[in-house]
């Protein structure tokens, strides 16, 4: 577990797989119950697929998946799905917008985009109700030190004393920073 409600799960597949950054997989609970989860790993990471699963008593949908993983130590997945994958245009500035475990989708796109073009201008806005919901913020800040074009904007709705990031909602922060988004590639 990364936090008391967020789990980093690495699936080691039995067979070869491929996907594009930004796509998701379906965890097969039974024939009629398939549950979508964004992949946090990149297509270049061939040994595993990483998921960030927010599982708690208020999210029984995801908790049932985590319970199965913890009990059986294996799951069946259907991969890949989704059309919101990273496009090949590597020149335009990029904005990534994520909330909570939605960061997994943004992480896959971010790491892939930086591998393709380490100097690309990328801004990632990551919001959470509380600072603890930004569970991989240290990883992002370390990446921003290696990539001068990467700007990390953490946003917390209910900040504690000493919070140094932005407050409010992610979309408010984006709109405060950008008059227009027309010249950016945007992934939400």
Regions picked out by a protein language model, each given a short descriptive name:
Residues 1-73, 128-130, 155-159:
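Ferredoxin-reductase
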Residues 47, 57-188:
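FNR/FR-type flavoprotein reductase catalytic core
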């Amino acid at each position: 577990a990364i936090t008391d409600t967020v789990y980093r799960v690495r699936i080691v597949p039995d067979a070869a797989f491929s996907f594009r950054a930004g796509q998701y997989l379906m965890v097969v609970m039974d024939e009629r119950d398939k549950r979508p989860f964004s992949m946090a790993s990149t297509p270049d990471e061939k040994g595993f697929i990483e998921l960030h699963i927010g599982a708690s008593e208020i999210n029984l949908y995801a908790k049932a998946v985590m319970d199965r993983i913890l009990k059986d130590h294996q799951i069946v997945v259907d991969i890949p799905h989704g059309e919101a994958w990273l496009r090949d245009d590597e020149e335009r500035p990029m904005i990534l917008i994520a909330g909570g475990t939605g960061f997994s989708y943004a992480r896959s796109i971010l790491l892939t985009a930086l591998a393709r073009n380490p100097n690309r201008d990328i801004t990632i806005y990551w919001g959470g109700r509380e600072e603890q919901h930004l569970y991989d913020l240290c990883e992002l800040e370390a990446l921003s030190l290696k990539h001068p074009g990467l700007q990390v904007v953490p946003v917390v709705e209910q900040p504690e004393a000493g919070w140094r990031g932005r407050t409010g909602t992610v979309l408010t922060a984006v709109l405060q920073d950008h008059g227009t988004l027309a010249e950016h590639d945007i992934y939400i």
